[in-house]
């Protein structure tokens, strides 16, 4: 079992190499359907498996197409990693869509909507001459 420091270093190397492959190495047209970036890489403690989290910008159809392209390119990515990263055994590659950025954007949008609604409600109350009792406390 590798140390945490080694696992983190291997994850960092894999992230860098896969990012470079996404920019220039993968020739599958489906991968180019949406803008793809590697957001995180998780490597198992025994360095046998790696999950590569990718963020995809585009329509839902483009995202699905891009994920299919990435899944079909997993064996190519693994063989390239074997040549670029010096490991005794190259880990199995699994691509996972990272929806964290998308969810974060949705949360921010909802918060902005709530703020606008509250401001409109307060403006309507002020125009009617009603004072909010929570502000007096």
From Swiss-Prot:
Compartments reported by the entry: Cytoplasm
One Pfam family it belongs to: RBFA
Domain of life of the organism encoding this protein: Bacteria
Keyword Ribonucleoprotein: no
InterPro entries referenced in this protein's UniProt entry, alphabetically: KH_dom-like_a/b, RbfA, RbfA_dom_sf, Ribosome-bd_factorA_CS
One function term, GO molecular function aspect: ribosomal small subunit binding
Record GO biological process: maturation of SSU-rRNA
UniProt entry tagged with the keyword Cytoplasm: yes
Subunit structure, as described in the record: Monomer. Binds 30S ribosomal subunits, but not 50S ribosomal subunits or 70S ribosomes.
Name under which the protein is recorded: Ribosome-binding factor A
PROSITE patterns named in the record: RBFA
Family listed: Belongs to the RbfA family.
Protein task: One of several proteins that assist in the late maturation steps of the functional core of the 30S ribosomal subunit. Associates with free 30S ribosomal subunits (but not with 30S subunits that are part of 70S ribosomes or polysomes). Required for efficient processing of 16S rRNA. May interact with the 5'-terminal helix region of 16S rRNA.
Gene designation per UniProt: rbfA
Cellular component terms (Gene Ontology): cytosol
Principal cellular location given in the protein's record: cytoplasm
Alphabetical UniProt keywords: Cytoplasm, Ribosome biogenesis
């Amino acid at each position: 079992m590798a140390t945490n420091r080694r696992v983190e270093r291997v994850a960092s190397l894999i992230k860098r190499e896969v990012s470079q492959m996404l920019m220039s190495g993968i020739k599958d047209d489906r991968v180019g359907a949406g803008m793809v970036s590697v957001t995180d890489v998780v490597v198992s403690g025994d360095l046998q498996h790696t999950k590569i989290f990718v963020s995809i910008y585009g329509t839902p159809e483009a995202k699905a197409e891009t994920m299919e392209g990435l899944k079909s390119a997993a064996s190519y990515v693994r063989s390239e990693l074997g040549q670029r990263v010096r490991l005794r055994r190259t880990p199995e590659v699994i691509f996972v869509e990272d929806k964290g950025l998308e969810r974060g954007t949705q949360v921010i949008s909802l918060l902005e909507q709530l703020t606008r609604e509250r401001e409109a409600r307060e403006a309507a109350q002020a125009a009617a001459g009603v004072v909010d009792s929570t502000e007096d406390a």
